[in-house]
């Protein structure tokens, strides 16, 4: 089985919150696909609560699109990591990490402005596979920590494990 790119970086050196351009690739028609690591917590030190990360998934999907999408960049997907330390975001285009950082911080401010769980998008049994597993408070706590700490930018080359450098 091939080793995935995400396992070629030293997770013990990852700061958080931080954004990292994990990889870029070209489609057969020449479009650029960029994959970003949005690391909310330090790996193996802390993890996001299951209700908090689930609610954040619903909120960040729309907010990041509002702040990052433009004529040259379109978010394909933002998915939580199985380790519950962050999200992977795939986009058509090549935004730089600083644009992603600004969009992420703006999105966290948007999360803090949500007043009621009824305002969480797709929070119903028809559009969500676990509609009871949400917490606006926990998502807002996550957003506040991101804003309090500030988002930094990681360099993938500096994080490569020596066998892959």
Curated annotation (Swiss-Prot):
Homodimer. It comes from the Bacteria. GO terms for biological process: quorum sensing. It holds the Pfam family LuxS. This is S-ribosylhomocysteine lyase. Its EC number is 4.4.1.21. Keywords: Autoinducer synthesis, Iron, Lyase, Metal-binding, Quorum sensing. Fe cation binds at residues 54, 58, 128. Involved in the synthesis of autoinducer 2 (AI-2) which is secreted by bacteria and is used to communicate both the cell density and the metabolic potential of the environment. The regulation of gene expression in response to changes in cell density is called quorum sensing. Catalyzes the transformation of S-ribosylhomocysteine (RHC) to homocysteine (HC) and 4,5-dihydroxy-2,3-pentadione (DPD). Belongs to the LuxS family.
């Amino acid at each position: 089985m091939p080793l995935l790119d995400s396992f070629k970086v030293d997770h013990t050196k990852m700061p958080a919150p931080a954004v990292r351009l994990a990889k870029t690739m070209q489609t057969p028609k020449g479009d650029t696909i960029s994959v970003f690591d949005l690391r909310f917590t330090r790996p193996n030190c802390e993890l996001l609560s299951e209700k908090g990360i689930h609610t954040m998934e619903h909120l960040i999907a729309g907010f990041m699109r509002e702040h990052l999408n433009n004529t040259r960049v379109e978010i394909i997907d933002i998915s939580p990591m199985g380790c519950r330390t962050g999200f992977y975001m795939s986009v058509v285009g090549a935004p730089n990490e600083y644009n992603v950082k600004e969009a992420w911080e703006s999105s966290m401010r948007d999360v803090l402005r949500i007043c009621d769980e009824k305002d969480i998008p797709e929070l119903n049994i028809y559009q969500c596979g676990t509609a009871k597993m949400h917490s606006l408070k926990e998502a807002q706590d996550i957003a506040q920590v991101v804003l309090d700490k500030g988002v930094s930018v990681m360099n993938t080359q500096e994080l490569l494990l020596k066998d892959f450098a």
